[in-house]
Amino acid sequence: MAYPFQLGLQDATSPIMEELTNFHDHTLMIVFLISTLVLYIISLMLTTKLTHTSTMDAQEVETIWTILPAVILILIALPSLRILYMMDEINNPVLTVKTMGHQWYWSYEYTDYEDLNFDSYMIPTSDLKPGELRLLEVDNRVVLPMELPIRMLISSEDVLHSWAVPSLGLKTDAIPGRLNQATVTSNRPGLFYGQCSEICGSNHSFMPIVLEMVPLKYFENWSASMI
């Protein structure tokens, strides 16, 4: 999860987030090289005597500054499109969970079970136990099996919301009347925190999301106790 004064991304917990982190580093390196080149040219202009001030045509230079940006954009677009299609793929999910956004809480329904559904509200600061996180803890966590593909169906009962868990590389809009889907796959067990990421009213800041990723055996025991 995030911590104060953090400069980088959260630790990747899913294959998609690992891909997004690598793409971020790839793009940032390209930006760094371009920025270095531009600063070098500016420093030359400021520290050396200008020459060729009367040049009216430079076909070679124009060719370079047309082709080079196109190549750079292709180097950015290709891995971006690859990740985009990976995020849309859902192959044989073992579980489907329907998520509904409300003002201002989330409700969850495990569609593979008959009566496994609940609402998830933020725990007020006054009710927190020692060690719990302010504005991030909920009364009912979403318990899911780790290392297995899970399909999340996301919508809203009222206004626009956005269901986001940064460490899993997830951010999907919850739109009234529309059903969006996302894939959740966690590489390790643990608690993973997120929040509503679309301004949805006065209590927008009080819609946390907590995923508890556990081994399959523990998930089966939990689901049996909830039914």
Curated annotation (Swiss-Prot):
InterPro entries: CcO_II, CcO_II-like_C, CcO_II_C, Copper_CuA, Cupredoxin, Cyt_c_oxidase_su2, Cyt_c_oxidase_su2_TM_dom, Cyt_c_oxidase_su2_TM_sf. Gene3D superfamilies: 1.10.287.90, Cupredoxins - blue copper proteins. Binds a dinuclear copper A center per subunit. Residues 1-14, 88-227 are mitochondrial intermembrane. Its main location: mitochondrion. Residues 46-59 are mitochondrial matrix. It is a multi-pass membrane protein. One of its GO terms (cellular component) is mitochondrial inner membrane. The modification Phosphotyrosine is found at residue 218. Mg(2+) binds at residue 198. Its cofactor is Cu cation. Its EC number is 7.1.1.9. GO terms for molecular function: copper ion binding; cytochrome-c oxidase activity. Belongs to the cytochrome c oxidase subunit 2 family. Component of the cytochrome c oxidase (complex IV, CIV), a multisubunit enzyme composed of 14 subunits. The complex is composed of a catalytic core of 3 subunits MT-CO1, MT-CO2 and MT-CO3, encoded in the mitochondrial DNA, and 11 supernumerary subunits COX4I, COX5A, COX5B, COX6A, COX6B, COX6C, COX7A, COX7B, COX7C, COX8 and NDUFA4, which are encoded in the nuclear genome. Component of the cytochrome c oxidase, the last enzyme in the mitochondrial electron transport chain which drives oxidative phosphorylation. The respiratory chain contains 3 multisubunit complexes succinate dehydrogenase (complex II, CII), ubiquinol-cytochrome c oxidoreductase (cytochrome b-c1 complex, complex III, CIII) and cytochrome c oxidase (complex IV, CIV), that cooperate to transfer electrons derived from NADH and succinate to molecular oxygen, creating an electrochemical gradient over the inner membrane that drives transmembrane transport and the ATP synthase. This is Cytochrome c oxidase subunit 2. It comes from Leopoldamys sabanus (Long-tailed giant rat).
